[in-house]
Amino acid sequence: MKSALHESRADTAEGTSSASSAWKSVRALPARTLIFFIELYRTYVSPLRMPTCRFMPTCSEYAVESLRTHGTIKGLLLTVVRLAKCAPWHPGGWDPVPARHDRHAGSRRCCPANVDEQRST
């Protein structure tokens, strides 16, 4: 038999979970909107033009992938930098979207490994 305290904690955890997923959906909305317009471009405008992109993946593929990987702000910034490279003086070639880095990965350990070794000597 569950206690009232246990049930209220479970309800709170479920509420937090659904609120968190709702917040993620709201945060993803601008990126999804941009991806929608990029897909419109790829479907209706791009086929009418000669293929001229000098990069792999193409600039529109890069934009969609960067928005999905990094979110709206950083994805848009990466896309603008990529489009700025699209000029006759840049050779083009393979230019993938950079991998997403965990921003908290460095904060898990406060000290370099050798500090503990120095303390023991």
Swiss-Prot record:
Keywords from the named record: Cell membrane, Membrane
Pfam family for this entry, one: YidD
Report the superkingdom from the record: Bacteria
InterPro entries in UniProt:
Membr_insert_effic_factor_YidD
Question: What's one GO-annotated cellular component?
Answer: plasma membrane
Q: Does the keyword Cell membrane apply?
A: yes
Matching entries from SMART domains are given as: Haemolytic
Q: Where in the cell is it found?
A: Cell membrane
Question: Topology relative to the membrane, per the entry?
Answer: Peripheral membrane protein
What the record says about family reads:
Belongs to the UPF0161 family.
Q: Which HAMAP family match?
A: UPF0161_YidD
Provide the function of this protein.
Could be involved in insertion of integral membrane proteins into the membrane.
What's the protein here called? Putative membrane protein insertion efficiency factor
